[in-house]
Regions:
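All-beta strand scaffolds that present successive hydrophobic residues in beta-strands
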Residues: 1-3, 24-28, 49-56, 72-79, ...
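Consensus "Asn ladder" position of solenoid repeat domains
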Residues: 4, 9, 30, 35, ...
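Short coil-to-beta transitions that initiate beta-strands within beta-rich domains
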Residues: 8-14, 47-50
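Short glycine/acidic-rich loop motifs that flank beta-strands on beta-rich extracellular proteins
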Residues: 10-17, 36-42, 63-69, 86-92, ...
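Short polar/acidic secondary-structure junctions
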Residues: 32, 44-46
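Membrane-proximal low-complexity regions enriched in glycine and acidic/polar residues
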Residues: 52, 60-61, 65-67, 74, ...
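Acidic, glycine- and Ser/Thr-rich low-complexity intrinsically disordered tracts
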Residues: 72-183
Length: 183
């Protein structure tokens, strides 16, 4: 799946791209913009020892940029742009963040530095879910996702965690500056 602009899938079940029991696929040079869920991946990759490769895509202004709903892993995500999404990535299973490979992606909310000016952040990008676990585990609570109560709960959870946050992803070499998509 290459060189597409996918946008405005905003209904209750709106999904830009959906993978169900898919294997050995390439998703490259696409723009997934303004969707309820940019990419939904369920039991994908399905076949053992295969991968789904996401490369040079832009995920912008989605409710959830990528939602993985299985614990299989096997996705490789490199050189993608994540900007302006309410939530960049959701892993529905517990303890599965290390089963997908992340490398060289740009995250608009990365808070690290690039002291040696090589274009790569000095510290890994790690995304944790704190109060988000409420709506991840109880999907009907997603209606309240940006409400003041859940935002306050998320702030308090980060300040003084009363439960262990769940790691959603770890990119050991995040891009520090947003790459130019026209090149």
């Amino acid at each position: 799946l290459r060189n597409n602009i996918i946008s405005h899938a905003t209904g209750a079940t709106g999904m830009g791209l959906g993978f169900k029991e898919s294997s050995d696929s390439d998703v490259e040079n696409n723009e997934v913009i303004y969707c309820a869920i940019g990419v939904g991946s369920d039991l994908s990759p399905f076949e053992p020892d295969t991968t789904i490769r996401f490369k040079n895509n832009r995920f912008a202004f989605n409710g959830i940029a990528i939602r993985f709903t299985s614990e299989l892993g096997g996705n490789i995500l490199t050189n993608n742009i994540f900007e302006g999404n309410l939530t960049d990535v959701v892993q529905m299973g517990r303890g599965v963040a290390d089963k997908n490979q992340w490398h060289g992606n740009y995250f608009a909310d990365y808070q690290g530095f690039d002291r040696n000016a090589d274009g790569v952040g000095d510290t890994p990008y790690e995304l944790y879910s704190y109060a988000d676990q409420i709506w991840i585990e109880t999907p009907t609570a997603q209606f309240f996702k940006t409400s003041p109560v859940l935002e306050l709960l998320d702030f308090l959870e980060r300040l003084a965690p009363f439960s262990s946050p769940e790691m959603q992803l770890r990119d050991p070499a995040p891009r520090f500056a947003k790459p130019d998509r026209t090149a």
